[in-house]
Amino acid sequence: MVFTALDPLGVPLGTAQASFGTDGIRGRVGTLLTPAFILQVGYWCGQVLPDQGPVLIGMDSRSSGAMVASALTAGLTAAGREVWTLGLCPTPAVPGLIRKLGAAGGLMVSASHNPPEDNGIKVFGADGAKLSPAKQGLIEAGLRGEAIGDKGRPTITSCGPAYQRDELLSHYRDALLASVLHQRLDGVPIVLDLCWGAATACGAEVFAALGADLTVLHGEPDGSRINVGCGSTQLEPLRRAVIERGAIMGFAFDGDADRMLALDGQGRVVDGDHVLYLWGSDLQDQQALPQQRLVATVMSNLGFERAWQQRGGVLERTPVGDQHVYAAMVESNAALGGEQSGHILSAAHGLCGDGVLTALQLATLCHGRGLSLGEWLDQSFQAFPQKLVNVRVPDLERRMGWQHCEPLQEAVLAAEAAMGEDGRVLVRASGTEPLLRVMIEASDSAAVEFWTVQLADLAEQHLNRGCV
């Protein structure tokens, strides 16, 4: 979508390709995310969010965060809104504080797991949920210059105030501790990889408050190193530390701490599917899982689905994106849902992906059972072999329209026919990066390797050189 030069604030804009993707507006700082463009985003958010209450702004540790937050503040106050800036905080702190304080909404400045050069803007409504597609569309319409109730140029009497409210993060820390009923982790050896990101604001603090024997990696905010060789997308530093220090579990967060992946004491990965199975089994045992239902996405492993069905459970799948998981959970009154990548949503804890909260839940559930994470993982399911390949496809139109590439579509059908009920093919365009994701899953690992290579090569050949 192309946004052309606008002038509701007297600020000229160049053209920029942008829209709300699977997790807000995201792009390269200085290319898409210029101060002028960000100011306009803030202004139109101010037009769309409810009139009553302040608008909260949080951010991760990226070097560009202060610039983005300042430009958003300028746009929001120009729209007459009162702004409370929270400073460095995990993404889930924003919706949690929106609900606690009765705010009109909130914005989180983060590009999640993306590299330091990128940034992004996530927008939450007064209910603490990410904005609906309809409201996102209103903001996009404003950015295109289509009238949606513009209040006119700001004047000396129409501008809203802005306040720094870093102290509000203490409410979020308190909520994290309350989520595990202040259960203790005295002496439990745990490693945390805080990714130089938003988890540094409170991750180590809450685990230490419960008495854990902590080793902390990448534990200071560093906007030039966030997500670089660490965190939930690069688990090797955490794996080395867990094994070398004899920890029984480790947790790695992404840049804004709305998701996490865990490792057991042997360095085995405990992904979002395993978290859903283990936590869901605990809720099931307590008869606290309505309809025995879990909500996951199309990326979740087939081994997980079959094991959950053997427990008498129902697994509902959604498109990729935690907003889809959220919508399905609300509609079906589900207690737990999430993504394989580590976004976990709990109805009892605000229905927002929260990496630190999920890590606390896993740690205390294991400790309460007298088990290490590895011992609990052994009670989980056997995953089908699964491989995900990211094919770089910079051309947005070709990437989003990959289904129209006949050779690639024919190969997908051939793979599905060859693997039958014991395999799956998933090809999807990323909503946040210039990537086409190709995922193959099957009971036969050789088939996984073969078809992953075939489809990735075809995608690279045809989508980047013109589909023929």
Curated annotation (Swiss-Prot):
Modification Phosphoserine occurs at: 112
One Gene Ontology CC term in the entry: cytosol
Post-translational modification: Activated by phosphorylation.
Pfam families xref list: PGM_PMM_I, PGM_PMM_II, PGM_PMM_III, PGM_PMM_IV
A single BP term in Gene Ontology: peptidoglycan biosynthetic process
UniProt cross-references to PROSITE patterns, sorted A to Z: PGM_PMM
Database matches in Gene3D superfamilies: Alpha-D-Glucose-1,6-Bisphosphate, subunit A, domain 3, Alpha-D-phosphohexomutase, C-terminal domain
Catalytic activity of the protein: alpha-D-glucosamine 1-phosphate = D-glucosamine 6-phosphate
Domain of life assignment: Bacteria
Family: Belongs to the phosphohexose mutase family.
Function: Catalyzes the conversion of glucosamine-6-phosphate to glucosamine-1-phosphate.
NCBIfam families: glmM
UniProt-recorded name of the protein: Phosphoglucosamine mutase
Source organism of the structure: Prochlorococcus marinus (strain MIT 9303)
